């Protein structure tokens, strides 16, 4: 069950990498400028950045299973329809439908995972959510790689059609799996609309600040490797993919900590505080290739630790029945907001003050997030020295 729900996350995150890989072909075929295609790429985060918390409440009212089915169906329809886009209107329209599908999956699947794993104890639940936290780097890399490969054989329209067919197949598997809906009692429904604990707000805001510099740095890494290191665009893209996927190794480390019942307060602080310091070794004038790439990989590995522990904290900060959906929606909204704003803000820093200015911004964002993360990790219900229950 957890694996099937994780595959839904991979499918959703693959849409993040799909359009990036197909952007040059789409721009050439439809006669669009690359900035216009770049806007289409970013549209998938708009829904999460503006409606994440609201979507969490709607998912609670509609039912998690129904929300997940609808999300995967939107991804399938958008993939098949987008393959027939004839201009900017069609491209944007199908991408917005894709954003709806993406949002439906990310607000429902992790909550279903948490509900399913809860029966096996808090430690297993934390490990399951740690697995879920890898869906973005893994799905993004998979989407970019698969789309590029299929486009080489069948063109960008063929690649998008194939992606839509995969989504249809996954929807069919979901339908036959008969997922439990985990319907809540009326009391739990009322509690879902109650105020979230301050520690949950701290976790969500800290996660947003983390995404601000983490995604911003990853987005600018190819440009730095081309302009300052002298790599080709293809090599820069490949090393950026390696850096992104290294977050999965960080998630494995987080899983090891959870499995051994370690307190996560200091791992949370270290994995949030060290990456912006490493960024000063990456975002500099004419860095050595092996130094910049090595530090970027380490930076994203540590980021994977923080992201995984943040998801593992969710069920302990949203301990009231019914609040898990809303808490997950809030975390998704803050993370999407940071992902949406981080690249343009850090690019503006580079333009105004050079690469070091972007590293300074990353440090400021991290300093703002540290006390928030400390409060969340120190909450009395969230010392993840988990027992065997």
List where the protein language model places each region.
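Cytoplasmic helix-loop-helix junction between adjacent transmembrane helices
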Residues: 94-136
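C-terminal transmembrane helical hairpin of 12-TM major facilitator-type secondary transporters
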Residues: 264-313
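A late C-terminal transmembrane helix in Major Facilitator Superfamily
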Residues: 316-355, 362
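Paired small-residue
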Residues: 78, 89-98, 290-299
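Helix-loop-helix hairpin linking two adjacent transmembrane segments in secondary transporters
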Residues: 124-179
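Conserved MFS/SLC helix-loop-helix module at the cytosolic interface between two early adjacent transmembrane helices
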Residues: 50-86
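Helix-to-loop junctions at the C-terminal end of transmembrane segments
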Residues: 51-63, 250-263, 350
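Extracytoplasmic gate region of multi-pass secondary transporters
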Residues: 19-20, 198-251
């Amino acid at each position: 069950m957890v694996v099937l729900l994780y595959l839904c996350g991979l499918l959703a995150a693959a849409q993040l990498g799909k359009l990036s890989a197909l952007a040059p072909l789409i721009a050439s075929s439809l006669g669009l400028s690359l900035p216009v295609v770049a806007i289409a790429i970013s549209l998938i985060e708009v829904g999460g950045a503006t409606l994440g918390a609201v979507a969490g409440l709607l998912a609670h009212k509609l039912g998690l299973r129904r929300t997940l089915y609808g999300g995967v169906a939107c991804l399938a329809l958008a993939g098949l329809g987008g393959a027939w886009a004839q201009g900017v209107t069609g491209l944007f329209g199908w991408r917005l439908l894709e954003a709806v599908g993406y949002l439906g999956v990310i607000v429902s699947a992790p909550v279903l995972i948490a509900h399913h794993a809860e029966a096996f104890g808090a430690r297993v639940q934390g490990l399951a959510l740690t697995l879920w936290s890898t869906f973005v780097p893994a799905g993004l890399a998979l989407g970019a790689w698969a789309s590029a490969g299929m486009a080489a054989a069948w063109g960008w329209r063929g690649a998008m059609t194939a992606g839509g067919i995969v989504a249809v197949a996954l929807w069919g598997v979901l339908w036959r799996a008969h997922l439990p809906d985990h319907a809540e009692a009326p009391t739990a429904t009322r509690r879902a609309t109650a105020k979230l604990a301050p520690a949950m707000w701290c976790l969500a805001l800290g996660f947003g600040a983390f995404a601000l510099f983490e995604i911003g740095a990853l987005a600018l890494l190819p440009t730095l490797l081309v302009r300052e290191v002298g790599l080709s665009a293809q090599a820069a893209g490949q090393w950026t993919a390696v850096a992104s996927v290294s977050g999965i190794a960080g998630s494995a480390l987080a899983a090891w900590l959870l499995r051994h019942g370690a307190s996560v307060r200091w791992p949370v602080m270290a994995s949030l505080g060290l990456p912006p310091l490493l960024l000063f070794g990456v975002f500099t004038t004419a860095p050595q290739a092996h130094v910049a790439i090595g530090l970027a990989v380490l930076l994203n590995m540590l980021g994977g630790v923080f992201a995984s522990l943040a998801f593992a904290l969710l069920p302990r900060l949203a301990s009231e029945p019914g609040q898990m959906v809303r808490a997950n929606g809030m975390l998704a909204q803050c993370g999407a907001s940071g992902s949406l704003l981080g690249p343009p803000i850090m690019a503006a820093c580079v333009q105004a003050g050079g690469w070091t200015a972007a590293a300074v911004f990353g440090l400021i964002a991290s300093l703002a997030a540290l006390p928030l993360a400390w409060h969340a990790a120190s909450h009395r219900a969230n010392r993840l020295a988990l027992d065997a229950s």
